[in-house]
Amino acid sequence: MSCRAGKKLFQWSRVKSSTEEIVKQLTVPLREHAEPILTLTPEQKREAVRLKIQEIEHTKGQPPFFDMFMREHTYLRISLTEKCNFRCLYCMPAEGVPLKPKDKMLSNSEVLRLVKLFAAHGVDKVRLTGGEPTIRKDIVHIVEGISSTPGIKEVGITTNGLVLQRFLPQLRDAGLTKINISIDSLDREKFAKMTRRDGFDKVWKAIELARGYYPKVKLNVVVLKHQNENEVVDFVNLTKDRNLDVRFIEFMPFGGNEFKNDNFIGYREMLNLIVDKYGDGVIRLSDSPNDTTKAYKIDGFQGQFGFITSMSDHFCNTCNRLRITADGNLKVCLHGNSEVSLRDRIRCGDSDEQLSEVIQKAVNNKKARHAVFRNGRSEEPAKSSNDSYRGLTPVTSASSILVHLPSSSLYHSHLHSSRHFFISQIRCFSTTYSVSSITHLLTHVDNNGNAKQVDVSQKDTSTRTAVARGTIILTAEISRQISENTIKKGDVLTVAKIASILGAKQVANLIPLCHPIRLDFVDTVFNHDIENSKLHCISTARCSGNTGVEMEALTACTIALLTVYDMCKAISQKMMLTNIYLVHKSGGKTTYTIDNENQI
């Protein structure tokens, strides 16, 4: 080897090593992406949630939509149409996709009603998507209606830009605050190949027009290997003297786009290309809360760039997004198949309260992460909501435990039901209260210490809710068979769920001084801790009446656990029911909420 050749090889190795080292530093996860969404102590979390809910309920009047992982959903994406005037390679086949009839699509008024409903629950950001949203003829009126909805702070649109010039001035005047334009190549021929349409000039003119209207315009670039990855640096160069935020999007699988791993290029590989060009001039920026983008910029450049890394490094921990399809289906995860039709509910005459319950139920079923990244490998999107990965069967209102945290005292008037027990506790604490001063606190005991039923005829009728929790400790074998649904008697959790409903209906026949109640709703959900051989149960009861449903919730929970015992006792009697307690009650004179049994 000549001296000159050896010198070149040394220089190349040093550059490569330097690039790898820079990329390694640049891809260290930021705290908001590397850590779970909740990093507070339990006490801090309870206080933060209580204050946040108080703030939102004070201004909006409705509790926010929290999922079972305490992610608050404040961002709504609405697809306005299935139609598109492009046929992008990564999005749909050349012949397009089958379209639903127009009467199956959400109307203008239905869209605005849903926006108003979500805004009442704390959603403050709405983005309009498609298909191509600018195809919709009433797009300007929709933007105007959304922007004028109380509580909505941002209205954005994601568009391919083909006809944007025609509408942009009107959209801005109507209240459009954010704009994302999709453009996957800066080469006209390649652009036409990737979109199967000749529209580069119109799209570029739309970008330039938008730059004059908005302080920052986002460009969405889906990067495909062997297609446009060689343009990554060219797109970054656009940010030198332009107010652009270029977002490189990893190719994702979804219906109709014929996803192939051969076309996939991860963000670290893209970042390598940029660092090879700019070296340590690449700067990592801080990401905003709930941001989907890992943000960067080149030192001295006006704009910035980033990566949406749904495939290689998910951002599910901070996901605050919900989606409504053009035909009115609610999706809590882009990668999930689970949907619920809000359109059908609206057209059947559901009230806003009923719609809110449907939405909360769907949000409760949102998984910790989208299916593509379970167990560290790529998998098919979830087919069933009864998912052992989460250990949760479908839930309805368990998260209401978290969205009704009170600021009032945790005193519970039915905690002690025995006069003797109450007085013995008083002696332990050296108090000097008389029996008569104590028994008036016990609503089922008169001044002489005799049992009585409470007269509820003068109480106001209101919606009463109660939630109870309990646990059954299992053997490892029973736990395994429940998870695999191989118990000989049948589906344990389904039978226990039904039994809990039947049990709640029998409370007045079982507890002597309880009033018969017309229940509006009873539901039980299970959280199976397979590793520790525990099955946790949460039961919710609700009624519209003049007395509470705490006993119904507690009975439902207890009966559910007893049913599990009965279904499994042929395997082993070594099971124990434990920690059955009231978690939450609301709707009456007092509200009561507790996070765990240690607070009792």
UniProtKB/Swiss-Prot annotation:
Cofactor comment text: Binds 2 [4Fe-4S] clusters. Binds 1 [4Fe-4S] cluster coordinated with 3 cysteines and an exchangeable S-adenosyl-L-methionine and 1 [4Fe-4S] cluster coordinated with 3 cysteines and the GTP-derived substrate.
EC number annotated for this UniProt entry: 4.1.99.22, 4.6.1.17
Molybdenum cofactor biosynthesis protein C: region residues: 396-595
Highest taxon, organism lineage: Eukaryota
Residue numbers binding GTP: R77, R127, T158, K218, R321, L322, R323
Catalytic activity of the protein: GTP + AH2 + S-adenosyl-L-methionine = (8S)-3',8-cyclo-7,8-dihydroguanosine 5'-triphosphate + 5'-deoxyadenosine + L-methionine + A + H(+); (8S)-3',8-cyclo-7,8-dihydroguanosine 5'-triphosphate = cyclic pyranopterin phosphate + diphosphate
Domain annotation Radical SAM core: ranges: 68-284
Region (Disordered): 369-390
Annotated [4Fe-4S] cluster 1 binding sites: C84, C88, C91
The keyword Ion transport appears for this protein: no
Pathway: Cofactor biosynthesis; molybdopterin biosynthesis
Binding site for [4Fe-4S] cluster 2: C316, C319, C333
Pfam family, one: Radical_SAM
A molecular-function term among this protein's GO annotations: 4 iron, 4 sulfur cluster binding
Residues that coordinate or bind S-adenosyl-L-methionine: Y90, G131, S182, M252
An annotated GO BP: Mo-molybdopterin cofactor biosynthetic process
Region feature Molybdenum cofactor biosynthesis protein A, mapped onto this chain: 4-371
Active site: residue positions: D566
Keywords: 4Fe-4S, GTP-binding, Iron, Iron-sulfur, Lyase, Metal-binding, Molybdenum cofactor biosynthesis, Nucleotide-binding, S-adenosyl-L-methionine
Required cofactor names: [4Fe-4S] cluster
UniProt similarity note: In the C-terminal section; belongs to the MoaC family. In the N-terminal section; belongs to the radical SAM superfamily. MoaA family.
SUBUNIT field: Isoform a and isoform b probably form a heterooligomer.
PANTHER family in the cross-refs: MOLYBDENUM COFACTOR BIOSYNTHESIS PROTEIN 1, MOLYBDOPTERIN COFACTOR SYNTHESIS PROTEIN A
Protein name per Swiss-Prot or TrEMBL: Molybdenum cofactor biosynthesis protein moc-5
Organism: Caenorhabditis elegans
